[in-house]
Structure formats: C-alpha cells, structure tokens
Amino acid sequence: MKRYLLSTFTIAAAALLVTSCNDEMDNGLKTGDEGTVTFTAQLPSEMGTRAFADGLTAKHLQYAVYEAGQSTPLPVFGDETRVVGEAEMVDLKKSVTLQLTSGKSYDVIFWADATTDSPYTFDPATQKVSVDYSKVNNNSDNCDAFFKKETITVSGNQSVDVKLTRPFAQVNIGTDDFDAAKASGLEVTQTEVVAKAFATLNLATGEVSDEADRTFTMKAIPTASDGEFPVAGGYKYLSMDYLLVGADKATVDVAFNYGGPQNRTFTNVPVQRNYRTNIYGSLLTNT
C-alpha cells in the first residue's frame, strides 16, 4: 500500500528588526532625490536544521532592479554595465543597500540558490531563471532555491523586509520495508526519479514554461545527515527531489527507479508550490 501526503513547508517568518546607521538618516527627501533603501532578504526563519530543505545551501543571492512594470534592468550598482547585484546569505538572510530615486516605483527581483553546482541560470534581461536538467541529481539539496519580487515606491531612506519562498514542490519517497527487502537480497543504495517539471521560471510573474518529463539522475539514497523522512513511523528515506511547478496545485506521475526487478510508478501524485508531497508505504516488497 502506498500513500500520498501533501503538507506545507514551514514558511512563516518572524518580522525582522533592522537596525543600522540608516535609522538616523533624514527621510524628508524631495521627489527626484536619491533615497537609501535597505532590503533584507530572508528565507523562512524556522529553517536552519541541517537537513533537506533547511535553506542553508541557498547562499548565493542575486537581485536586479526595474522600473515598476518594466522588464529592462537598471544599472544601479555603481557601474553602467552592471545590472545584477550579488551577495552571500548568512544565517538565512542578507541585507543589501541601493540608492533609488525618491517618488519612483520599482520592481526588485531576488533569487537565492546554491553557491556551487547550482543547475540554475538567472537572466536579468528576461527576468527568468532556467534549469539545466543535465546538472540535476536525485537526492541533492543543491537544487533548493528561493525567489521573490518586491514592488516599492521610494519615499526617502527606508528599510524593506523581503520574504523569499520556494517555487518548487518537494517530493519525498520513503518505505518501511527497507530491512525486509535487504534480507531478501534487494539492497537499495541509489535511486532515480522521472517526473514532469518545468524548465523556466519568470521571477517577475511567477509563471513557468517548458514542461517535459525530467530525469533526476540516479544518486545515493539520503543519509542520516539529510534528516529523517518527514512522516513518522520508521520510514527509510529513499528519494528527495525539487520539482519546478506552477502556482496552482497539480498532479504528476512519478516513475521511481531503485534498482529492483522493476520500476515503480506512482500516478496522480499531488504537487504544489512551496509544499512537500510524501509518498510512503511498503514500497520495496509490496509490488
């Protein structure tokens, strides 16, 4: 028997108190003057547990600025040719400061992914992130990432909290017959998943495109350092993937290869952005 369980990521974040020298600056600027705007990009604050989906791999923060409703990136980083800012997230957050024109409205888009071995490329000219699935492996937290578009009307010197969220559904597979399968001669050491997922995300609109069957390449199964399977009951963690999905709830078929006599396919699996779906049961011996 297999079961599907859809549950939310912990996405609540405590309000941040931003203190800096900006607190003492005069906010009474006239329209057309420059204001100092400090953005604090924040991943969900209940993370940081050093397990899958802890957010700790998403340290590479990129951000770009546009006039509100426009798609041409602005060179606001002190160099006429530079249209993307970069910074390193520390303890799930990072504050960055921009000089923006008082009285004008801006869209600022943020993207945080892994510093190394990330399969994602951000193009500020299109406001899109693309996925290179040749770099996507099963059971890899380097595929975790977060985004947010923040629209702001500058009214002088100010601070803005920006709460980033995942554009993915996390799909986990676990079994309670791992030891029984091993005793019968089937020892599962690697797993692979094939499922439909998108390859492009528009950071300004949240829309996705280029859906196809994607292979999350065979890799070693999760270990204790990756955390326990999200469902209680002694389930062995066999597989974890991040699927780029649309904003609406959907269903996908998940093909699961574990090196057994035949692959398993789980049909009509519910997936939703920023939620996790857990597939679990006696999956290795109950075929």
Where would I find each of the regions flagged by the language model?
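Sec-type signal peptide cleavage vicinity
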Residues: 2-11, 17-287
